[in-house]
Every structure is written in structure tokens, then in C-alpha cells.
Design a protein with these regions (language model features):
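Residue at a conserved register position within TPR or TPR-like alpha-solenoid repeats
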Residues: 65, 108, 150-151, 186, ...
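TPR alpha-solenoid repeat register
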Residues: 100, 178, 215, 249, ...
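Alpha-solenoid helical repeat scaffolds
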Residues: 36-43, 79, 86, 122, ...
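Structural signature of alpha-solenoid helical repeat junctions
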Residues: 53, 94-96, 136-143, 174, ...
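Helix-turn-helix repeat elements of alpha-solenoid scaffolds
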Residues: 25-42, 67-86, 113-129, 154-162, ...
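Conserved structural position within tetratricopeptide repeats
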Residues: 83, 126, 167-170, 204-207, ...
Length: 467
């Protein structure tokens, strides 16, 4: 009988829990590759990490710790969230705490501590009953909290985050926090079809809260894309002056300067952010990519070798920090491979190329990798056969792309050189036949060979930029 009563209590409790607005009912990790990737992105990649979102972050951390089975740590984060809410939203503490209390209830439920879970369900119920609802209320503050949570959780949550902020603004259209959330969500969704012009939401958010420096930076980045660079730079300068230590502002400003080609200013800002967040692998990644861009710049201009070596060392140091902490960064291993090849450290270059090949790559990324590795084999390793193999494999992926065209040209030049020495070279003729088939060229192979011979046989020298 006691067992039946316990089961009935559990089922009743679970029914109540499903009605709560909580991280446990929002499906935040739906579609994620791994919990590690999710946690890394939430804690390190996402911006707006400043003080006003500490309670939001604590609730997300509590949810992650629960998913890992670290229940004591989860409860610890929920206690921190409560404290931040009391401190930052004293006049709305009850409503702002509903999500946290819901998370408490879920954690205790999974621990089998049903009485404590019921205690938090009842706390939610008491507040909601003031609004004539048993376990959830339609509160703009709750919609806002869900919106911020979803924004922190990555790109696949941006659309739902935008809906949350729109819903909150319907009830309170002049609320600065709700307007900021909508502006940020609109900015992020602008890169995906259907395009959503974020300029008006961004300007409205600034009108409602002129002190929101992060939103100013986002508006500046959008204006830069619209070729309104002067206004964009003015907004960034103003934001940096008023919030010189805000890491989200600094990172956004660095992005703007990097786009304009002012790599030194971008690096200076990112290093400043790194002082506040020394272990943030995304900052190391961005700094490393800036140094890599400077390497390409100096190399193109024929700069001093010592300067080039210094820049390569900086690029390697930061990119290695990022790669060692998160091996899934897009192209970072191949960047490292090319940089090591530049300084003659071929074993390290080979290691990072193979590391990149071992990943699950998109067709575009795989084609770029075949191009880079083919260049490495051709120019550094002097292994023509391997280079040809990788250029052929790369061209097969997408011959119409920029990379595909480069590899077709390289294969043709290699065939030209062979034919200039021996017009019957079998490897050269095989290459030309492959290219002829690739281009669906119906001309005879011999005629095609004559045309290729006339086009010259020069292969340019290799460099990191030679892609």
C-alpha cells in the first residue's frame, strides 16, 4: 500500500513538474552533438557575459551539472542564482525566481527527494495562484528569462528566443531589457534566410537604454556591412569609452576592427579581454586567427623574415591553446599545419593535417583541406604524386568552387611541365584525360594537350597564402 501511495505521489509530482517553466521543460540540448560542446559554447563562446546575466548563467550551469549527474553542484548553482536574483531584482524577486524554483523541484525529483521537490512546486504554485494560475503564469519577465537562456544556448535557439522577447514586448513594449533581447536575437538571425533586418530593433533598444554598450557594438557591426562605416566606428568608440572593461563590448569591437583590416587594433582589444578571461579558448582562437591574417599580410608585402617568424610564433601559440582545449574548431588544425609548414616543422605540420582529416568535415571544409595538404606535399615535401592525388580528390568534391578551380589549374600546370619534357608522359596524359572528363570537354585529348602546352608551364612558389 505504501508503495502504491509513493508511486501515486511521484506521478502527481511529475505531472506538476511538466507544467513548470524550467530548463528541464525547454529542450535546450535538443540537437546537440554532445554535452561537452554545449557547455563549452554556453560558458565560453556566447557573449553578453556581464553581471546582469549571472542568475541566468547559474541556472544554465545548474542544468548542465544535473545532466552530468553532479547534483550537489547543481544545487549550489541554484543557490547562487537565488542570491543574484535577490540582489539584482529585489522588487521582482518572487516572479524572477520561478524558473530557479522549478529547476530546484526537478533536481530534487531526480534525486528521489520528493518532499523537497514538492516544496518548490508549492512555492511556484503560491506565486502563480496570485495570478489565477496553478503552476505557470504568462509573465513577460518569465518570457524574458527564457529568451536570455535560449540566446545563451546557441544558434539553434535564436528563433525561439526572438519569439520569447516579442511576446514579452507585447505586454510591455517600452521595457529596455526586453527590447535588448529582441535586438540581439534579430541581429543573430540576420545571417540566415529569411533575412531579418535588425537595424530598427537595435536602434529601438539603444533609445530605450542608451547605456547598453553591447547593443551599440552590434549596431555598428551591422552598419559596417551596410557601408555606413563612419557611424559604426563612432558607435564602437563610444561603447569602448563608456564600457572599457566589458568583455562582450571588447570582443564585438575587435570583430569590427578585424573586418576593416585593422588587425593590430583587433589584437590589442582581444588581448585586453584575455586579461579578464585568460582561459577563454575562443579569445585565443580569435587572436590566433588575427595573427595568421597578419602573417598572410606580411608575406604578401614581402616583409622582414624575422617579423614573419615572430607573427607565426604568436599565431601558433594562440591557435594551439584553442585546439588543445577544443579540437572541433573549424579549420584550426589545418591553420596550424600550414603555419608549422612555413617554419619548416614538417612533422608537426603532418600531425595537424592528419588531425584535421580525421574529423567529420563538411564537403566545403574537406575540399579546402585537400587543397592545403596538396600544396604542402607539392611545395614543402616535394612529393608530386601525393599532391596530385589530393588535388584530384579535392576537385571531385565540387569543381565549380573557387578551391576546385585552383586545384584544376594546379593539375593542368603539373601536366604542362610533364608534357614539356615528354609529350607522351602517361601521368600527364592521364591528368589531362581526367580534366577533360571533368569539364565535359568533347575535344580529343591530343587537341586538349596542345592547348595546355601553349598555356605555359610556370608553377608559382608556395606560401601560406597559396591556396
Amino acid at each position: 500500500m505504501d508503495r502504491e501511495v509513493c508511486e501515486t505521489t511521484k506521478n502527481s509530482l511529475e505531472h506538476s513538474l511538466q507544467q513548470l517553466k524550467s530548463h528541464f521543460t525547454w529542450n535546450l540540448v535538443e540537437g546537440e552533438h554532445s554535452l561537452d560542446d554545449f557547455e563549452d559554447r554556453v560558458c565560453n563562446e556566447s557573449e553578453f557575459q556581464n553581471s546582469e546575466f549571472k542568475a541566468t548563467m547559474c541556472n544554465i550551469q545548474a542544468y548542465i551539472k544535473h545532466r552530468r549527474g553532479q547534483h550537489d553542484a547543481a544545487l549550489g548553482y541554484l543557490r547562487q542564482a537565488e542570491e543574484f536574483i535577490r540582489r539584482e531584482h529585489a522588487d521582482q524577486a518572487e516572479v524572477r525566481s520561478l524558473v530557479t524554483w522549478g529547476n530546484y523541484a526537478w533536481v530534487y525529483y531526480h534525486l528521489g527527494r520528493f518532499a523537497e521537490a514538492q516544496l518548490y512546486v508549492d512555492k511556484v504554485k503560491q506565486v502563480c495562484q496570485k495570478f489565477s494560475s496553478p503552476y505557470r503564469i504568462e509573465s513577460p519577465e518569465l518570457d524574458c528569462e527564457e529568451g536570455w537562456t535560449r540566446l545563451k544556448c546557441g544558434a539553434n535557439q535564436n528563433e525561439r528566443a526572438k519569439v520569447c522577447f516579442e511576446k514579452a514586448l507585447q505586454k510591455n513594449p517600452k521595457n529596455p531589457e526586453f527590447a535588448s533581447g529582441l535586438a540581439i536575437a534579430s541581429y543573430r538571425l540576420d545571417t540566415k534566410p529569411p533575412s531579418q533586418d535588425p537595424v530598427n530593433p537595435l536602434r529601438q533598444a539603444i533609445r530605450l537604454n542608451p547605456d547598453n554598450q553591447y547593443v551599440k557594438v552590434l549596431l555598428a557591426l551591422k552598419l559596417q556591412k551596410m557601408n555606413k562605416k563612419d557611424e559604426g566606428e563612432r558607435l564602437v568608440e563610444e561603447a569602448l569609452e563608456k564600457a572599457p572593461l566589458a568583455t562582450d563590448v571588447i570582443r564585438g569591437a575587435a570583430k569590427l576592427y578585424r573586418r576593416t583590416g585593422d588587425l593590430d587594433q583587433a589584437i590589442e582589444l582581444l588581448r585586453k579581454a584575455l586579461q579578464c578571461m585568460p582561459n577563454n579558448i575562443y579569445l585565443h582562437c580569435h587572436i590566433g586567427c588575427c595573427y595568421r591574417a597578419k602573417v598572410l599580410e606580411v608575406e604578401k608585402m614581402g616583409g622582414e623574415r624575422e617579423e614573419l617568424q615572430r607573427l607565426i610564433r604568436h599565431a601558433i601559440d594562440h591557435l594551439k591553446r584553442a585546439d588543445e582545449s577544443n579540437g572541433n574548431f573549424f579549420r584550426i588544425s589545418s591553420y596550424l599545419a600550414c603555419l608549422y609548414a612555413q617554419v619548416g616543422q614538417y612533422e608537426e605540420a603532418e600531425y595537424y593535417f592528419q588531425k584535421e582529416f580525421s574529423k567529420e568535415l563538411s564537403p566545403v571544409a574537406k575540399q579546402v583541406l585537400h587543397l592545403r595538404y596538396g600544396n604542402f606535399q607539392l611545395f614543402q615535401r616535394k612529393c608530386e604524386d601525393k599532391a596530385i592525388h589530393h588535388f584530384i580528390e579535392g576537385v571531385k568534391i565540387n569543381q565549380g568552387s573557387k578551391e576546385g578551380e585552383k586545384m584544376r589549374n594546379k593539375l593542368q600546370r603539373l601536366a604542362n611541365i610533364k608534357l614539356s619534357k615528354n609529350r607522351a608522359d602517361p601521368k600527364a596524359l592521364h591528368l589531362l584525360a581526367f580534366l577533360q572528363e571533368l569539364n565535359e570537354d568533347m575535344q580529343p585529348a591530343a587537341e586538349y594537350s596542345e592547348r595546355c602546352l601553349d598555356s605555359g608551364n610556370h608553377i608559382p612558389s608556395a606560401s601560406l597564402a597559396e591556396e
